[in-house]
Amino acid sequence: MQHADENHGIALSQLVEGNPVATIVIDAQHRVTHWNRACSVLTGVPAAEMIGRSEQWRAFYDTARPIMADLVVDGVLESGIDLYYHGKFSRSLLIDDAYEAEDFFPAFGEGGRWLFFTAAALRNAEGEVIAAIETLQDITQRRRAEAALREK
């Protein structure tokens, strides 16, 4: 992506923060660089507890394990992603080295939440992976409506 001005870092932060879709960005060392307001609302974890740390898994899981962005930033092959998201993920049809998945998170909200999430590598001008971005959307209402239709 080409940037029109020298303040693209500020613009990126503003873009991520203003995005109504929960968004996480991690660097190549797995440190959270961006945890937007929507992500704080979705997870109940404030950005101040995540930025600069490598424990993003705590917002989603009871035990230490990678989130999808961690796998993508490491260049893990599909077989490695399958270890964590078996039967729940697919390659992005739009972006190379990107994946999407749906999964249930029982600790979120009352009765848990279904999330649809995507993760993609971010590369520098030389093509090296320097970060990964993950977006998350609450699809619980849709999943419950689908289940209700199946029960009829």
Residue ranges, per PLM feature:
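PAS-associated C-terminal cap
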Residues: M1-A11, N124-E128, Q137-K152
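PAS/LOV-family and closely related PAS-like sensory domains
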Residues: A11-A131
